[in-house]
A protein has these predicted regions:
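Asp-based phosphoryl-transfer active-site loop
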Residues: 2-18, 38
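Substrate-recognition element of Asp-dependent hydrolases with the DxDx(T/V) motif
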Residues: 6, 26-54, 84-89, 138-147
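Catalytic-core regions built around general acid/base machinery
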Residues: 21-33, 128-135
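A short, structured active-site edge motif that brings together acidic residues
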Residues: 63-74, 108-110, 144
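Short, charged N-terminal beta->alpha structural module
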Residues: 76-100
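Short acidic low-complexity segments
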Residues: 101-111
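Active-site glycine- and acidic-residue-rich loops that bind
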Residues: 117-125
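Residue-level detector of conserved catalytic or cofactor/ligand-binding positions
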Residues: 147-157
Length: 157
């Protein structure tokens, strides 16, 4: 089976609305027996949340193996590692990482700092992360999409 991959934000949907023509295009791809993989660099939603959103918008079942996000890659990366992780990000990110790994709220106990989306950073938080790095801690960052355009309503043609 051949596979095609597509981005989500701005390609399949804008905010919570399907982009006109997407459903018809995906039905056409299904007719040609193409497996569709949905890719995003957004780490603010768990893969299950994205799958549920797509199912509601597309009116079809979406398997989790069709979803590729930074969290999917993170889960695979951490699969056989046993390390304490300090999460500097949203509650959603902390909850997801806590479901797949050992999370600590004490950065000094961590072997890995994971930086995700967080609306505001303090200088103390930045200093603590730098100190952890200088003490040998691995630092990993998920995207901060500075180019994402937020549109309140999809453009209709």
């Amino acid at each position: 089976m051949n596979t095609i991959a597509t981005d989500l934000d701005g390609t399949i949907y804008l905010n919570n609305e399907i982009i006109p023509g997407v459903i018809e295009s995906l039905l056409d791809l299904d007719k040609h027996n193409l497996k569709i993989i949905f890719i995003t660099n957004n780490s603010s939603q768990a893969p299950m949340e994205i799958s549920n959103k797509l199912e509601k918008l597309l009116f079809k079942d979406i398997d989790l193996d069709q979803i590729v996000t930074p969290l999917v890659i993170l889960k695979q990366y951490l699969e056989n590692k046993n390390m304490m992780i300090y999460v500097h990000g949203s509650d959603n990110l902390s909850n997801f990482v806590n479901s797949i790994a050992n999370v600590t709220t004490n950065i000094d106990e961590s072997q890995m700092v994971l930086i995700g989306r967080k609306e505001k950073y303090t200088q103390l938080e930045v200093n603590n992360i730098m100190s952890a790095y200088q003490n040998g801690c691995n630092i990993y960052a998920l995207n901060k999409d500075l180019s994402l355009i937020h549109i309140s309503e999809p453009t209709r043609r």
